[in-house]
Amino acid sequence: MHDDVDVSGLPEGITPLGNQIYAIDTMLAGYPGVVSAYLIRTERPCIVEVGTAGSAPVLRDAVIRLGLAPEDLATIVVTHIHLDHAGGTGDMAALFPNAEIVVHERGARHLADPSRLMASAKMVWGDRLETLFGQMHPTEAARIRSVAETGEVDLGAGRKLVSHYAPGHAKHHMGLVDTGTGDLYVGDALGVYNPLTGDLRPATPPPDFDMDACLRTLGLFRDIGAQRLMFSHFGAHDTVTETIDRAEDELRLWVETVRDSRDTGGDLDHAIAMVRDKVVSRYKPLPADASAGTVAVLDTLSGPEANVSGIMHWLDKLAQEQAEAKRKAEEERA
């Protein structure tokens, strides 16, 4: 049942990628080109990333279009629990009754009880929360399997997804390697790739962004030697080494620009303005026919406001840690 898909006439939001893998546009907030989910249609079918609550019916319809019944899905994996990646987990669990839900151990409790996550999101997004993400519903705890530094998902016939803890963007983030293809599912660890322009921007939101952890994760991803990078934002890319190098270069440029602003006494607004002037201005202009909604959502998720806020938060935390270390050293010398 897993090698008989007629790929002719597939809907625009479903893209065959070979090796029984299909990218599915989750249509976040109704807009295309924002979040990619992936169906691995093997003996034990698996979906990587679920998008928001509003994305669950989109994924159900795609799975059925690709010749599977909802009962066939064996596993649902989320790279991390941010709402654009995992907000629909509870809805997906209801639609796919036999699927095990796999998440990093630091995020597992929030899938079972998303009340704290939703309260935090409400503080960040305000009135935009419902429009962008909808409500995250609880997932039955017995169906959740958490993984730590590494873990495995059985895809059948000896093929597996191997998880690797990949913090920096979030403390509950992991990457996933398909042992049958060498594909690496990167979540937000490399940032946001804009298919409209080819630009790659970092994703550095508060409160978890950590530059040092990001760089370690990029090093881990280099060492994996992947054949292809599967972005959650957005799509598959086979220029692996070049793309990881670009991700690091962009990350360093954003952080250095914000640091320069902060070191000269600039506040958040000043840092955002500097990033727009010195960094964002380098990116290619959007095509004239680009969806205004897609552009707005991408800018909301990984634009200067969110990214600079996360970088400033990390720099402030770093300064506090350095000051505390200095104070303790002086006390020891006294």
Model-found features: residue ranges?
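Divalent-metal (often Zn2+) His-rich catalytic cores of metallo-beta-lactamase-fold enzymes
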Residues: 215-269
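Core dinuclear metal-dependent hydrolase active-site scaffold
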Residues: 39, 150-178, 183
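C-terminal regulatory/interaction regions
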Residues: 2, 260-334
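Metallo-beta-lactamase
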Residues: 2-5, 72-84, 111-164, 215-218
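Conserved beta-strand hairpin/beta-sheet module of binuclear metal-dependent hydrolase folds
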Residues: 7-66, 70, 176-186
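Active-site metal-binding loops of divalent metal-dependent hydrolases
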Residues: 50-52, 81, 106-107, 169-170, ...
